Design a protein with these regions (language model features):
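N-terminal initiation segments
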Residues: 1-252, 256-261
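An anionic, glycine-rich sequence signature occurring as long contiguous blocks
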Residues: 263-281
């Protein structure tokens, strides 16, 4: 299978056809955007993202010869003109839904994220072992919605996504994402959180409450509920209630325990201490 064919299998193409192209064509100058032209435009974006230190995007369309000392390392004129590229960039839309009657700073991308998750939930079967973690989407404008700073990350500034991927065979495929909205999470006209999760409040079957972390764990693993598959997490997800909620939903969760003075609540720390007592580590 060629790279483009494999990419299109993994990409929510139906959403592009039904939403992106029609919504963009309502705004674009010149000829309507076609599906093939959209993939050319997207490919140019991906190609430019592979190179660092090119401060001016227009250099990719420069008429000057390629130089070892300055400018871009390639020219994109044979694929798309700079004017057409800018026209598409100005007109590109990722939703065809009207804005809600409350302030939602994520409205323009919410449908895109839902389309990605739905595509993988319907078309992809994750392996038996999966990894849930955080990912940073680098963004240098601190006024972007949901802007966060994590100094310990390689790219510390931008949007934080929680993401889950296959952990088997060393070939990870990310199959579900959730944008962390932080202080920009919207509320509806009644003052309640908009877009509530089905995993909030109390589990009717067990009577166990959902914490914020437990809610996130259940949301991110929803496509594999009832499968008996495993999700591995770092210490940020080491919440006993969350692990138990996953177990009740048919998913086995394991998380690194970051032990300080005391063991986490409900963990049989004394038994663990006795088991390792005298053993060589």
């Amino acid at each position: 299978m060629k790279e483009l064919a494999q990419f299109r299998i993994c990409f929510p193409g139906q959403w592009v056809k039904d939403v992106v192209i029609p919504a963009t064509n309502k705004e674009i100058n010149g000829d309507p955007l076609t599906l093939s032209e959209f993939y050319i435009y997207l490919g140019c974006h991906f190609f430019m993202a592979c190179f660092e230190g090119i401060s001016d995007q227009r250099l990719w369309w420069s008429s000057k010869p390629v130089s070892m000392r300055d400018g871009a390392s390639f020219r994109l004129n044979e694929f798309i003109s700079l004017r057409r590229y800018n026209d598409i960039t100005s007109a590109i839309r990722y939703t065809d839904k009207p804005p809600p009657d409350f302030v939602d700073r994520f409205h323009d991308v919410r449908q895109m994220i839902d389309a990605f998750n739905q595509h993988y939930a319907e078309e992809y079967i994750p392996s038996w072992l999966n990894c849930l973690d955080e990912s940073m989407n680098s963004w240098l404008d601190k006024f972007c919605p949901g802007f966060m700073s994590f100094p310990r990350k390689p790219h510390p500034l931008g949007n934080e996504y929680h993401s889950i991927a296959d952990g088997d065979d060393g070939k990870p495929v990310m199959w579900r994402i959730k944008l962390q909205e932080g202080k920009d999470r919207p509320k509806d006209a009644t003052g309640k959180w908009a877009f509530p999760s089905k995993f909030e409040g109390t589990n009717a079957a067990s009577g166990r409450k959902f914490s914020k972390t437990a809610t996130l764990m259940c949301e991110m693993t929803e496509p594999i509920h009832g499968t008996g598959k495993i999700v591995s997490m770092d210490s940020g997800f080491c919440v006993t209630a969350g692990i138990l909620h996953l177990h009740e939903l048919g998913v086995y969760g394991q998380a690194l325990i970051k032990k300080r003075k005391y063991w986490p609540k409900d963990v049989p720390g004394d038994q663990i201490d006795r088991y390792f007592d005298g053993k060589e580590l």
